[in-house]
Amino acid sequence: MAVMEMACPGAPGSAVGQQKELPKAKEKTPPLGKKQSSVYKLEAVEKSPVFCGKWEILNDVITKGTAKEGSEAGPAAISIIAQAECENSQEFSPTFSERIFIAGSKQYSQSESLDQIPNNVAHATEGKMARVCWKGKRRSKARKKRKKKSSKSLAHAGVALAKPLPRTPEQESCTIPVQEDESPLGAPYVRNTPQFTKPLKEPGLGQLCFKQLGEGLRPALPRSELHKLISPLQCLNHVWKLHHPQDGGPLPLPTHPFPYSRLPHPFPFHPLQPWKPHPLESFLGKLACVDSQKPLPDPHLSKLACVDSPKPLPGPHLEPSCLSRGAHEKFSVEEYLVHALQGSVSSGQAHSLTSLAKTWAARGSRSREPSPKTEDNEGVLLTEKLKPVDYEYREEVHWATHQLRLGRGSFGEVHRMEDKQTGFQCAVKKVRLEVFRAEELMACAGLTSPRIVPLYGAVREGPWVNIFMELLEGGSLGQLVKEQGCLPEDRALYYLGQALEGLEYLHSRRILHGDVKADNVLLSSDGSHAALCDFGHAVCLQPDGLGKSLLTGDYIPGTETHMAPEVVLGRSCDAKVDVWSSCCMMLHMLNGCHPWTQFFRGPLCLKIASEPPPVREIPPSCAPLTAQAIQEGLRKEPIHRVSAAELGGKVNRALQQVGGLKSPWRGEYKEPRHPPPNQANYHQTLHAQPRELSPRAPGPRPAEETTGRAPKLQPPLPPEPPEPNKSPPLTLSKEESGMWEPLPLSSLEPAPARNPSSPERKATVPEQELQQLEIELFLNSLSQPFSLEEQEQILSCLSIDSLSLSDDSEKNPSKASQSSRDTLSSGVHSWSSQAEARSSSWNMVLARGRPTDTPSYFNGVKVQIQSLNGEHLHIREFHRVKVGDIATGISSQIPAAAFSLVTKDGQPVRYDMEVPDSGIDLQCTLAPDGSFAWSWRVKHGQLENRP
């Protein structure tokens, strides 16, 4: 066995090598002590020299080795033990020939003093060799025999070194943990494992075993470069020490030790949890609050030092400086998905689209800000027939709309679109971001029922959300009713049955449509297929089945004429709401007009809550099973109302009773059905009962009054003369009219009467109606979710005759606009059919002065437009709406093919001018093709700008 010396490259005089040490052996050695010389003599006697002549130096190398005691003046060196493999072949196999190298840092570990240099020289005083980290593969018998003889001679002579060395083996005092292994790769090749910066003061086996993670992590001097050489955990501890020198404690300690023979993984801890709103940031990156922009330490750092402990242990816990966010807030996979989807358009799955739609709804529900200048483009397409290009899908670039508009509603309009790359055509619904609801996509995304219009994807482009869906060439069921007047019983049952199939499919997935009506049922090109669409009012029900209230302070679902009583009363709602609405749709198909409108005017919400269900509007010619099915679906209490599946079975049996579907797809026009006089008199008598409280009112007076008033609510019949001429006008004294003088409502203008010969009645009948409404509202106040002041506010809004829409006004919107009449058109740039206008107006009425998603008296801008025939349109629109958009929205109410808007004094206005918050007063002007007076116009519903 020989001991060789290898110089350290980092120390001075590093050129010392083995060849330089050998000649030094020829020099005269100092006299040895008594014990040392005796050992030398014993070895010389027992073994004869092997080499002679100039190679005698090798005898000393083999027998004594070359290890020397280091001196302060000599060069710094690391001594290693080398031993021959066999006697014949003098090969040296060093026990440790590699320096400590830390992977990833490209640096050798540097010790601070020579005392930390590992020295594996055996301690002669202990009479045994230090444990070897590497064992040779071959052990010859001669080696074992020589080792045995050497140990015996040492024990017999009691040899000891002149200068005692440390009693602890150098492997144990080494600052670098040495891993014992039976494999030849047992050299301590460290992979970013925690390193000590100073040697342990009292080395022992317990420190080798790493019983406590973080033991010895006490840096004497702050060294900012340590993060390159140690693990991230120690780096965090080091940074903490630099900023908090007064806290000398280490990071929290683990509760379970681990064996020293297995070095710990750099991160055997809990998963790192990022901070909102940057889910994909790195662990040591932007840990800062969004609002304060201050460094935000991670509150989960205490968990980094806990291997299995569920609670943070004592130590330098880092408290968050932003208390607005929860300390234990965790990110879900959905949030990471949304972060990856934002800012691009891609083809994906339905769940990706719904996750992204939530961010759109949240952005639109914030306080209204100026429209973004940049046209952001992001979304998910669910079909391969719509292909994004370079992660974009923009209008007029990748797809284009056709000139003809398929339909429009209170929140948007529907066009036919075509993909420029594939040529695929479908329908696109354009919705403003401010009124977009995520439920519109969450409810229908991924549905596969043939009774639900398939969704092809949605893309947000600036302030607009474009929803792509299947194109059904047959139009809507509401358009068919307008074209046909009213539908035959068999065809109405046929479409109702298909709509109930779609509702049954939705209800099985706990989805409430919320706005079932004829306008939201689309038909195929041959009229044989019907499917539900427009999930703008859809609600996802809770799995417990308890339902939820749909009526809130700033949102009213559905259409007023199809609204269920529990919705009006603000009670808990479930899937039975859609059943009520479907039966109201059935009455619309059979009668050609919406329910309730033939008997009542004004705020129908109070009538729906107080009056019996509209079963009297069932045509007498209907089959018994048809009438029974409608009655079962119009039960006022939801618990007594049938489900969609049960009603579907009744409708199918009723269709079989009438002989199945036999009527043609598009037959002859039929006049809408009007209620018989006795039913009208009955309803109006109930409505006029408070007049009997007057002592001057004779007994038959209410009957006469209702006789004269009933035809007023009926659409005019051309073959017959006006009904009011058949009855004498109603005269009321001033005292009698003064008795019904509600102070909050006295300034309201009455609706114009049809009979010009009764001027007094023109003023007294609306007062009577308002008085009756006020009494009913007070009686129902316990069931209404409104305070007394809010009820008076509702009455003051509802009393405006904007809601008095007769059936003939539905057919001709221009007739509905009378002098000084406020249409309350709302939604997206006044896009509203008459049915939708009723729904949106009801939505505004119950807004109660709070910020709403639709413009109202309280949060919209006022726009007054004088039509070509002198009528005034009073419109409430969104803030920052443009004049051109308003003109496009009212194009159906202007009796001209092409028109433009100017100020009251005739000055032109730009089509892109935003309406100021104070409002604007405009008037219509003709814009024919041959005129050069207009710079822009609206022709056939399309905005044109003169180049």
Swiss-Prot record:
Gene3D superfamilies reported for this sequence: Phosphorylase Kinase, domain 1, Transferase(Phosphotransferase) domain 1
Binding site for ATP: L406, G407, R408, G409, S410, F411, G412, E413, V414, K429
BP-aspect Gene Ontology terms: cellular response to mechanical stimulus; defense response to virus; immune response; MAPK cascade; non-canonical NF-kappaB signal transduction
PTM per Swiss-Prot/TrEMBL: Autophosphorylated. Phosphorylation at Thr-559 is required to activate its kinase activity and 'Lys-63'-linked polyubiquitination. Phosphorylated by CHUK/IKKA leading to MAP3K14 destabilization. Ubiquitinated. Undergoes both 'Lys-48'- and 'Lys-63'-linked polyubiquitination. 'Lys-48'-linked polyubiquitination leads to its degradation by the proteasome, while 'Lys-63'-linked polyubiquitination stabilizes and activates it.
EC numbers: 2.7.11.25
A molecular function (GO) term: protein serine/threonine kinase activity
Associated disorder: Immunodeficiency 112: An autosomal recessive, primary immunologic disorder characterized by variable abnormalities affecting lymphoid immunity, including hypogammaglobulinemia, lymphopenia or paradoxical lymphocytosis, and recurrent bacterial, viral, and fungal infections.
Protein name (Swiss-Prot/TrEMBL): Mitogen-activated protein kinase kinase kinase 14
Lineage: Eukaryota, Metazoa, Chordata, Craniata, Vertebrata
